[in-house]
């Protein structure tokens, strides 16, 4: 943050170094724990990050189909990140941020959750999140979602060997994983 109080007194100079410092801290903790298999994902980056970060995350999208900050924006951000070298990235299935303040209502619907899970089958990581309004948002365990979500997770599992090949190629050639 620009208002940070640092020993050398230069928060603006340090500003763009925070993502790297955070990744360094996480890698150090993993080494100390002897747990290099644990996945840590990041949503900020820097030049050289792909070789040092296990997974990127698109951030807290709105729980809608929108291209400015919803499902479409996550997909576009991941594709753009992929061609920029961030080959291992994902988004919260269904988005995260809902709004329930009249007159604005942005609540995750079963249809959005299913469509988001469907395209996430083709990403390096299929990960759910209950979102910031769990009692209002559709969830993967809801009666009108669970069968479709189970089908998508079976598809994701069935693609494991293919995904491994794609990820290995991404690591060797820098080709986006999606």
Q: Model-derived features: where do they sit?
A:
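Catalytic-domain carbohydrate-binding cleft regions of carbohydrate-active enzymes
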Residues: 1-178
